[in-house]
From Swiss-Prot:
Positions on the Cytoplasmic side per record topology: 53-60, 127-139, 224-243, 299-318
Protein name, per record: Olfactory receptor 5M5
Positions of transmembrane segments: 32-52, 61-81, 106-126, 140-160, 203-223, 244-264, 278-298
The protein's role, per its UniProt record: Potential odorant receptor.
Protein family (similarity comment): Belongs to the G-protein coupled receptor 1 family.
Main localization (coarse): membrane
Subcellular location, record wording: Cell membrane
Keyword Membrane assigned: yes
Topology in membrane: Multi-pass membrane protein
Extracellular membrane side: 1-31, 82-105, 161-202, 265-277
PANTHER family in the cross-refs: OLFACTORY RECEPTOR
PROSITE patterns: G_PROTEIN_RECEP_F1_1, G_PROTEIN_RECEP_F1_2
C-alpha cells in the first residue's frame, strides 16, 4: 500500500491525498467491474441526454412536467459523472489515489446534487398535485416564470448547502491514515479518518441530511395525499387510470432514491455501516440515474411518441 503523502503544518503532518479502496480489493474482479460500470454509465449518459434532447426538440413536451423531468435528467447525469469516471480509472489503475482538493470537490458536488435532487423530486410531486387537483388553474399557476423559479430554487439551495457542508469537512484535520474505505469521497469514511474533533461536522451532517430528507419527503407525501383524495373523488374510471399512470413513474423514482438515501444517512459512521453504505451507494449513484429515464418513458406515450418521431425523421432524412 502507498504511504500517505503529507504536508507539514505546525507540529504535525497533513494528508494531501487519499487512497480509495473501491468496491473490492480482489484484482480478478476489477476488469469485470470496469466493464459493468462502464456499460451502466453509458446507458445513464445516453438515457438522460436522450431525454433532455427529446424534451428540447419536441414542442409537445414543452410543458412544466417535462421541464422538471429535463432538469432531473441533467441532475442524474451530473450526479453519476461526479463519481463514475474516477471510479472507472481506479478499476484499471494500481494507484487508486485522489488528491485532497479533488476529494473536497467530489464531496461538494455530491452533497449539492443530492440535496438538489431531493427538492426537484418534491417540485415534481407539487407539479402533479397542481395538474390533478387544480386542472383549471394549472396553466396560470405553473407559468414559465414559476417553473424557472421552481427549478432554480433547488439548485441554489442545494449548492449553498453543499458549500456549507464541504466547509465543515475542510476544517477537519487528516494526519493519520489516508485510506478511504469507499469508491468515492464520502463524508462517513472521511469522518472516521479525521484526527480532529468531528462533533460539529457529524452534527451538521445528520441535521442537514435529516432536515432535507424529511422536509422534501413531507412535501411529496402531502402532495400525494391530496392527489389520492382527488383521484378517489373522480367518477370516471378512465380519469383515475390516467391520474395513477401520471404519478406512477414519479412514485417509483422517489421510492428508489429516497429509500436508498434513507438507509445511508440514518446510521452512524461505523465500520459496518461504511461497508453497507458502499452497497447502498451503488443504487443511488449508478442504478437510480440509469433507471430514471427508463422509468419515466416506459409508460409515457408522449415521450415514446417523441422518440419514434425523431427516429423516423432521421431514417427518412437518409
Amino acid at each position: 500500500m502507498l504511504a500517505p503523502k503529507k504536508m507539514v503544518r505546525g507540529n504535525y503532518s497533513m494528508v494531501t491525498e487519499f487512497i480509495l479502496l473501491g468496491l473490492t480489493d480482489r484484482p480478478e474482479l476489477q476488469p469485470l467491474l470496469f466493464v459493468l460500470f462502464l456499460v451502466i454509465y453509458l446507458i445513464t449518459v445516453g438515457g438522460n441526454l436522450g431525454m433532455m434532447v427529446l424534451i428540447r426538440i419536441d414542442s409537445r413536451l414543452h410543458t412544466p412536467m417535462y421541464y422538471f423531468l429535463a432538469s432531473l435528467s441533467c441532475l442524474d447525469l451530473c450526479y453519476s459523472t461526479n463519481v463514475t469516471p474516477k471510479m472507472l480509472v481506479n478499476f484499471l489503475s494500481e494507484k487508486k489515489t485522489i488528491s485532497y482538493a479533488a476529494c473536497l470537490v467530489q464531496c461538494y458536488f455530491f452533497i449539492a446534487m443530492v440535496i438538489t435532487e431531493y427538492y426537484m423530486l418534491a417540485v415534481m410531486a407539487y407539479d402533479r398535485y397542481m395538474a390533478i387537483c387544480n386542472p383549471l388553474l394549472y396553466s396560470s399557476k405553473m407559468s414559465k416564470g414559476v417553473c424557472v423559479r421552481l427549478i432554480a430554487g433547488p439548485y441554489i439551495y442545494g449548492f449553498l448547502s453543499g458549500l456549507m457542508e464541504t466547509m465543515w469537512t475542510y476544517r477537519l484535520t487528516f494526519c493519520g491514515s489516508n485510506i478511504i474505505n469507499h469508491f468515492y469521497c464520502a463524508d462517513p469514511p472521511l469522518i472516521r479518518l479525521s484526527c480532529s474533533d468531528t462533533f460539529i461536522k457529524e452534527t451538521s451532517m445528520f441535521v442537514v441530511a435529516g432536515f432535507n430528507l424529511s422536509n422534501s419527503l413531507f412535501i411529496i407525501l402531502i402532495s400525494y395525499l391530496f392527489i389520492l383524495i382527488a383521484i378517489l373523488r373522480m367518477r370516471s374510471a378512465e380519469g383515475r387510470r390516467k391520474a395513477f399512470s401520471t404519478c406512477g413513474s414519479h412514485l417509483v423514482a422517489v421510492t428508489v432514491f429516497y429509500g436508498t438515501l434513507f438507509c445511508m444517512y440514518v446510521r452512524p459512521p461505523t465500520d459496518k455501516s461504511v461497508e453497507q453504505s458502499k452497497i447502498i451507494a451503488v443504487f443511488y449513484t449508478f442504478v437510480s440515474p440509469m433507471l430514471n429515464p427508463i422509468i419515466y418513458s416506459l409508460r409515457n406515450k408522449d415521450v415514446k411518441h417523441a422518440f419514434w418521431k425523431l427516429v423516423r425523421r432521421n431514417v427518412l432524412s437518409k
